Amino acid sequence: MLQICCKNNNISKNFPIGSSLLDIYNGFNLDIPYGPVSAKVNNKVEGLNYRAYNNKDVEFLNILNPSGMRTYVRSLCFILCKAVEDLYPDGKIMLEHPVSKGYYCALQIGRETGLDDVSRIKQRMKEIVEANIPFHRFECHTTEVVELFRRKGMMDKVRLLETSGELYSYYYTLEDTIDYYYGSLLPSTGYIRKFDIVKYYDGLLLRVPNRQNPEILEEVVKQEKMLEVFKEHRRWNQILGVGTVGDFNVACNEGYATDLINVSEALQEKKISNIADKIYHRGKNGQRVKLVLISGPSSSGKTTFSKRLSIQLMANGLKPYPISLDNYFVDREKTPKDEKGDYDYESLYALDLEFFNKQLQDLLHGKEVELPRFNFTTGRREFKGDKLKIDDNMILILEGIHALNPELTPHIPAENKYKIYVSALTTILLDNHNYIPTTDNRLLRRIIRDYKYRGYSAEETIRRWPSVRAGEEKWIFPYQENADAMFNSALLFELAIMKDYAIPILRNVPNNKPEYSEAYRLRKFLEYFASVQDKELPPTSLLREFLGGSSFRY
């Protein structure tokens, strides 16, 4: 017998050696709403078919938990892939990226995807769910798994596994359909309760349950500009021949890492230059831009972007001047509080909007103003003779999480503003059926930066991340489509460079801490990438903001 300590109810019970997590769940007589879908076993996420052979701590997860939702979505993706294989034996589906609170998929069947195709796929998916077919996981020597995928023509998975360096690899089956997924799946298709698939521009959108209320599906949010950014970068990846991590690893092994760095950096600089040109030429057309507003989520590289944009604006004969929103906080005792009673510095209303807008209007009308400095020790605004008056060629650069919120600058005419949204939108795929979450990219950047510059451990950064994400959902993401331009700060090669920085930091998270499961997941994910050294990374690279070695001052 073995002893299982269930963290859901803090009760320990004995079970036969080799019991599955599903057996253990039933043995505890638990009733978890919207679950279970997976479990943490000694703080590592496992599927419900996992069998225990030693004493374990187990915490069962539902789809309200991010790890549980990932298990649900992966399983739903496999069902979609099987439906496409059943209906279009010569077709192919690519699960490309999250957008509009769902997942954008490209269906390749030799013609344009029609509404009838979507209807057939949805019906076949429903049939698969209703049949309650089990997902099976097999582990074999990597050479055997590679040969299995090679015979199926799934070369994206062949390249991924061949470059993984692993002696053994696993794969999943759903009846006669085989696939590879990074992470656990549900025990069977019948665990899927809600989903939808709809036509979305020239592809499909896989809709999933709402993260807070799984009884309903996530609302489809229009993100046309965001989708176009993803597609533009996917096109460049395909031109470079590195659409997936396997492709990237092969290119690195053949000595092309430096070329990929140089081309990726050049593409970003070209994009920044184009944005600066648009700002300049709008002024030539009689709608002079006086205020550039830059917003984006945490660790998106807003600061370096604003510095590089300023250089390109200067190359157009303009004089950029940075304005920090941090200097416009209300006095500390006037700061709004969150539901826990703590000061909510991320709230728009933590800023003195009336005073900020008055100073902006005065500046734009040619008046001289004395700029404030916020003293974070006293929690008060101070004035120290820092005066500013803008001339005809001067342009104000305002960077902050609220920059695209219409409430921030309601009195500034739209023609005088140019709004830019910056985010790290990962466009390389693990393989054709495994996208890389954009939040993972930003979290890894933040873990490295916090450790290097702020003295925070990975454990602390991971612990705070959910509250950071909640602030983004409330204050940033609703306004991203307001942007005049979107800039993707993610670099094709950056996860391969961050690998050697992040893994040692992540290893420091003790396995008895709740944050270990996320640290372990990120570590295993990074191990798919070939390591690339940062010696070829230019000092102006956006990635230098997080790794160090930048020629900019922060």
Language-model segment annotations:
Residues 334-377:
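Conserved nucleotide-sensing/catalytic segment adjacent to the nucleotide-binding pocket
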Residues 302:
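Conserved lysine of the Walker
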Residues 9-19:
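Short, contiguous acidic and Ser/Thr-rich linear segments
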Residues 283, 410-554:
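Conserved NTP phosphate-binding and transfer environment spanning the P-loop NTPase/kinase superfamily
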Residues 305, 309:
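Hydrophobic positions on the alpha1 helix immediately C-terminal to the Walker A/P-loop
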Residues 315-333:
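Short beta-strand-centered segment that lines the nucleotide-binding/catalytic pocket of NTP-utilizing
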Residues 50-53, 57-69, 83, 92-270, ...:
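Auxiliary tRNA-acceptor-end handling modules of aminoacyl-tRNA synthetases
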Residues 292-294:
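Hydrophobic anchor at the beta1->P-loop junction of P-loop NTPases
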